[in-house]
């Protein structure tokens, strides 16, 4: 599938990966160590650099809030990595980041798991231009950004679908359903009371092809006060 044409925007940053924000680096190293997320120094450098790239692109395109209430390295980068606490990304695994926006959670996870293949999809061309620019600047060989609507991905199959969107779980499951392989899973970063969302997703699954067959909730509010009421949601396909 060929990406759609999108607006040409020049990358706002084109610097080597070095001498990046030492405070952000120390924060990320400490956070990852506290959760047993093993990353080498080069991966830490790339994650910090990605945070900088995200901020620079955000000045041109609305990728994340411009009124941040927490450091980008915590609120966006580390938050994305927390999915790996509940899903072991493996070599050769095919992962779809649905509605990636500014590359979240796909780019941080692609940095952390270089042997896993990530496809980042968004319906907004400018966002995909930004994502591909960041992927290129970071030198990632296992991530690709595609300008597409989910309905246009027919015929593709993935082991895992990721989402950080605010859409209800039933909607996300509906998007993921035709794209997930048998035994695959949908992993979402969500917040708030999800009881009704989960019930609706399970009901709809039971009335269609059985996906999701189960839903797990993993609270992350004990990791940082910022993650109050936030959870990782794992919806499985048998």
UniProtKB/Swiss-Prot annotation:
Kindly list the positions annotated as binding S-adenosyl-L-methionine. Answer: 99, 104, 122-124, 150-151, 164
What Pfam families does the entry give? GidB (PF02527)
Q: Do the record's keywords include Methyltransferase? A: yes
Reported EC number(s) for this entry are: 2.1.1.-
Q: Has the keyword Methyltransferase been applied to this entry? A: yes
Q: Which Gene3D superfamilies match?
A: Vaccinia Virus protein VP39
Q: Which GO terms describe its cellular component?
A: cytosol
* Keywords associated with the record: Cytoplasm, Methyltransferase, rRNA processing, S-adenosyl-L-methionine, Transferase
Location within or outside the cell: Cytoplasm
**In which domain of life is the source organism classified?**
Bacteria
Entry GO MF terms: rRNA (guanine-N7-)-methyltransferase activity
Q: What this chain does, per the record? A: Specifically methylates the N7 position of a guanine in 16S rRNA.
Its family remark reads: Belongs to the methyltransferase superfamily. RNA methyltransferase RsmG family.
The name this protein carries in UniProt is Ribosomal RNA small subunit methyltransferase G
Its source organism is Chlorobium luteolum (strain DSM 273 / BCRC 81028 / 2530) (Pelodictyon luteolum)
